[in-house]
Regions:
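Acidic/glycine-rich phosphate/pyrophosphate-binding loops and surrounding catalytic core
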Residues: 1-188, 192, 201-209, 217, ...
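Short acidic, glycine/proline-enriched helix-loop-strand junctions
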Residues: 212-215, 258-259
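Short, charged, intrinsically disordered terminal tails
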Residues: 242-260
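Cys/His-rich Zn2+-binding cysteine-cluster or related metal-binding knuckle/ribbon modules and their
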Residues: 224
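Short secondary-structure boundary segments
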Residues: 197, 220, 242-243
Length: 260
């Protein structure tokens, strides 16, 4: 934004220098440190030290980054840097909670395209730092045939064959919401089938029917409280939209050192 930081300009001399620490107020999994570094540099703070790795599990009170430089410039960077760091670390922390919940199964936690506009790549990075895996990064990376595509194309087979003809080398995933649709989808030999809003019993049946011929992803109606039950059905992935659209920010603050 244009203009000045009125508060800092009025209360702090241009020559004042300080040392400040980005410190966690709660335990979690950290991500977005490289974004903080970019924000600091953009604001003219070039002396800083990153003290932990991306994806590190930290406790409350951990210093993540120490910055030293012009006090006005540090304060200019503060909120933007913290917004990125808290948001992305919140995603990593929530993802790690889901990953821990289904430990001991072969299932993996995946994100979705339900990301904040403009922040998709950063949010998907945060998911990886939390131990999750990414779904497609863009509409052009792979095809996902959903209910609206099926409705528009006429059938699952029509939609699949049209994509296969135009993009023979692209991965194709088919969304199904019934066992009957699943049986039709299997005959097409897609790379992945998404089981939409199916119960754990239906997911178990789907695993039995496919018998390893195609990877399965469950989505919809899954909470962290029943994640282990879904993972235990034998599906390969749980697709969790809340990782990116509902993750609470990790509490992180910026503290100036006294006398410095």
């Amino acid at each position: 934004a244009g203009g000045q930081d009125l508060t800092s300009v009025a209360t702090i001399t241009q020559s004042q220098v300080s040392t400040a620490d980005f410190t966690t107020r709660a335990s979690g999994v950290v991500s977005g440190l490289h974004v903080v570094a970019a924000v600091l540099e953009y604001c003219g703070v070039n002396h800083y030290e990153v003290l932990v790795d991306e994806g590190a599990k930290v406790s409350a009170g951990k210093v993540l980054i120490t910055a030293q430089g012009n006090t006005q410039k540090i304060l200019l960077a503060e909120r933007t840097a913290l917004n990125f760091l808290s948001h992305l670390s919140g995603i990593s922390t929530l993802t790690n909670q889901w990953v821990s919940e289904i430990s001991g199964t072969k299932c993996q936690i995946r994100d979705t395209r339900k990301t904040t506009p403009g922040l998709r790549m950063l949010e998907k990075f945060a998911v990886r730092m939390g131990g999750g895996v990414n779904h497609r990064l863009s509409l052009s990376q792979a095809a996902l045939i959903k209910d609206n595509h099926i409705m528009a194309a006429g059938s699952i087979s029509d939609a699949f064959n049209a994509i296969k003809k135009m993009y023979p080398d692209k991965s194709i995933e088919i969304e199904v919401d019934s066992i009957d649709q699943l049986k039709e989808a299997i005959t097409l030999k897609p790379d992945l089938i998404l089981l939409d809003n199916m119960s754990t019993d239906q997911c178990s049946e789907a695993v039995s029917i496919t018998n390893g011929l195609v990877k399965l992803e469950a989505s919809g109606g899954i909470a962290i409280t029943n994640a282990k039950a879904y993972a235990a059905t034998g599906v390969d992935y749980l697709a969790i939209g809340s990782l990116t659209h509902s993750a609470p920010a990790l509490d992180i603050g910026l503290d100036f050192r006294k006398g410095k």
